[in-house]
């Protein structure tokens, strides 16, 4: 019911305490003057897709990076905006709820009111459906009072539908025109921000004055690229899940007779599973990216787990904890191919009851091999982004079932001489995504809300609010905005020899980097985690004292700060221009040419190599 949105919440004592917490702002967002430096024009990270993206987004592709500056910064060509006319801005939650989303709204509201008390923030009720139907709630400080630093999306509600069809895009355009909006802020993940880019392009084409800004909020942690280090909600989800996992680890060690198979929410990528493993040290994690890269079959995975169980049994250990990402099922080559066939038939209108008889022989054989509960789940209609309904497919039960069958077989054959294998299965996801957000997510979301205002004040359209250098204290965060089109890639599929299918430009989920430092840390400890029971319990989410300022391990071990390095490069280039100018000596000119030629050759080689290897999910 729309009438339920925005009503005051009944708060516990802890919630009341959290509602009083005021997130810190970086220096560049303080005060009432917006200082923005626009850098060089951006390009797509893949040269092969740049042409396709530029054709699809002629008005918003190639826009410059925006850096917001502190008052003491001395930048000659900075734009200083001190006049702030009243604005009308709309905000909408798209996609699944993620802890911290409410603080984006709070930060945006505060920034609007600080710069002009007459500005208005309208929240669309019920997500994208409310956007299409022009259902709004004026967000006020009174309404926000019981939602500050709180979990969920119940302030405004949400939908998970895409803004995809021509009718939906035009409905959004009509809404923004009718409500005379200066800005529209879309809060969501990869799909929602792809939609934001499309809306921005459509609005620019239609000469609609509404500027569209995206905010990276998703528990999956898969909206990562050179501009976005992590997502709002990821820290909270991983901390809450890690506590649950570590509790299970302690239980396993106490009873010493169960193997726990735990599936974690997170869609196609395995970021949540990787982070939770580094925080809680379970015996084993199976990452979807590893499985896809090694082309491991269902039987390979079963053998891998069984061999681990047998190795532990030889040390008289009959317990363990194994983590699986929910996207694992789509990473197994033969199961992925089966799902593609099933989804194709479902889209053709074939009844689920008749699917099995219309599968290809090999797909039919695999389908018939699977236990009945998995068959039923694989027949579910796919999501709007064409992926399987991953949260509904009990991969943990499938793997436990196959491992149990194989261990019983080994026991019968005499190749395994240990105790009977016992499995217990869990799915962690819904338990965490409505949690009170962590201190980091509260700060990060609030800062991004303020950045949204700065983006709109600078008149930028088709941008995503960004904060980088996040592993450092808030006062060292770099605030800016990047064109969403620069984050896009274009998928290509080899349909058959000599024929390639090209997809639409989109932000694709970022996979776990199997060459990254976080994965390297996991591999370094994998054998010890498997055999030595080094279970680690981070405890409940902390808001004060030890642990309150902890950030995701995967964020802290990676050396990111792309925006900072872009600024540093610009400083070096400016120095070169200062030194090498008409009138400089021959020696200086020759040295500059020699160095530049070498640098250019190296960068061209590195660029082509890295782009060839970049494969989004």
From Swiss-Prot:
Regulation: Allosterically activated by fructose 2,6-bisphosphate.
The family this protein is said to belong to: Belongs to the phosphofructokinase type A (PFKA) family. PPi-dependent PFK group II subfamily. Clade 'Long' sub-subfamily.
Organism: Ricinus communis
Pfam families xref list: PFK
Function: Regulatory subunit of pyrophosphate--fructose 6-phosphate 1-phosphotransferase.
Cellular component terms per the entry's GO annotation: cytoplasm
Protein name from the UniProt record: Pyrophosphate--fructose 6-phosphate 1-phosphotransferase subunit alpha
Source species taxonomy: Eukaryota, Viridiplantae, Streptophyta, Embryophyta, Tracheophyta
GO molecular function: 6-phosphofructokinase activity; ATP binding; diphosphate-fructose-6-phosphate 1-phosphotransferase activity; metal ion binding
Pathway(s) where this gene product acts: Carbohydrate degradation; glycolysis; D-glyceraldehyde 3-phosphate and glycerone phosphate from D-glucose: step 3/4
Domain of life (superkingdom): Eukaryota
HAMAP family assigned: Phosphofructokinase_II_Long
Keyword annotations of the record: Allosteric enzyme, Cytoplasm, Glycolysis, Kinase, Magnesium, Metal-binding, Transferase
Compartment list: Cytoplasm
Subunit composition and interactions: Tetramer of two alpha (regulatory) and two beta (catalytic) chains.
InterPro entries tied to this protein: PfpB_PPi_PFK, Phosphofructokinase_dom, PKF_sf
């Amino acid at each position: 019911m729309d009438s339920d949105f925005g009503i005051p919440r009944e708060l516990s004592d802890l919630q009341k305490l959290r509602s009083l917490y005021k997130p810190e702002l970086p220096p560049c967002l303080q005060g009432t003057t917006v200082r923005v430096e626009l850098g060089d024009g951006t390009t797509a990270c893949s040269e092969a897709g740049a042409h396709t993206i530029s054709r699809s987004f002629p008005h918003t592709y190639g826009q410059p990076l925006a850096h917001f500056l502190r008052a003491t910064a001395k930048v000659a060509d900075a734009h200083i905006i001190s006049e702030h006319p009243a604005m009308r801005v709309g905000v909408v939650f798209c996609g699944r709820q993620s802890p911290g989303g409410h603080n984006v709204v709070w930060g945006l509201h505060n920034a609007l009111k600080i710069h002009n008390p007459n500005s208005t923030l309208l929240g669309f009720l019920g997500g994208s459906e409310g956007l299409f139907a022009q259902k709004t709630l004026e967000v006020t400080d009174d309404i926000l009072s019981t939602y500050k630093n709180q979990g969920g999306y119940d302030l405004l509600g949400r939908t998970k539908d895409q803004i995809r069809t021509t009718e939906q895009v035009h409905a959004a355009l009509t809404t923004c025109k009718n409500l005379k909006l200066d800005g529209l802020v879309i809060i969501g993940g990869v799909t929602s921000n792809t939609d934001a880019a499309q809306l921005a392009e459509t609005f620019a084409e239609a000469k609609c004055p509404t500027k569209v800004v995206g905010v990276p909020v998703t528990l999956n942690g898969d909206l990562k690229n050179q501009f976005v280090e992590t997502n709002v909600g990821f820290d909270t989800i991983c901390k809450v899940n890690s506590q649950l996992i570590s509790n299970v680890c302690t239980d396993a060690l106490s009873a010493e007779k169960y193997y726990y198979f735990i599936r974690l929410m997170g869609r196609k990528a395995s970021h949540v599973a990787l982070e939770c493993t580094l925080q809680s040290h379970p015996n084993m994690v199976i990452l979807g990216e590893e499985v896809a890269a090694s082309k491991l079959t269902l039987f390979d995975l079963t053998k891998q787990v069984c061999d681990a169980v047998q190795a532990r049994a030889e040390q008289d250990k009959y317990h363990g904890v194994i983590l699986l990402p929910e996207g694992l099922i789509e990473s197994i080559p033969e199961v992925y191919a089966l799902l593609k066939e099933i989804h194709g038939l479902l889209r053709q209108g074939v009844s689920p009851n008749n699917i099995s008889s219309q599968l290809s022989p090999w797909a039919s054989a695999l389908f018939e091999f699977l236990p009945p509960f998995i068959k039923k789940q694989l027949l579910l209609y796919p999501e709007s982004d064409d992926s399987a309904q991953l949260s509904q497919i009990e991969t943990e039960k499938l793997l436990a079932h196959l491992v149990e069958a194989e261990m019983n077989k080994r026991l019968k054959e005499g190749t395994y001489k240990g105790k009977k294998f016992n499995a217990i299965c869990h799915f962690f996801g819904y338990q965490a995504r409505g949690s009170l957000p962590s201190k980091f997510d509260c700060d990060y979301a609030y800062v991004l809300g303020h950045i949204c205002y700065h983006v709109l004040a600078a008149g930028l359209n088709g941008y995503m609010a960004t904060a980088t250098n996040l592993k450092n204290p808030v006062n060292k965060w770099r605030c800016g905005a990047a064109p969403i089109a620069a984050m896009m890639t274009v998928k290509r599929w080899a349909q058959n020899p000599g024929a390639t299918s090209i997809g639409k430009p989109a932000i694709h989920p970022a996979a776990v980097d199997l060459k990254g430092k976080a994965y390297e840390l996991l591999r370094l400890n994998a054998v010890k985690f498997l055999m030595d029971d080094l279970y680690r319990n981070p405890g409940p989410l902390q808001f004060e004292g030890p642990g309150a300022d902890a950030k995701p391990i995967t964020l802290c071990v990676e050396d990111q700060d792309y925006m900072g390095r872009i600024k540093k490069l610009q400083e070096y280039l400016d120095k070169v221009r200062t030194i090498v100018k008409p009138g400089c000596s021959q020696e200086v000119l020759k040295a500059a040419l020699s160095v530049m030629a070498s640098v250019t050759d190296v960068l061209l080689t590195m660029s082509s190599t890295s782009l060839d290897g970049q494969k989004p999910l």
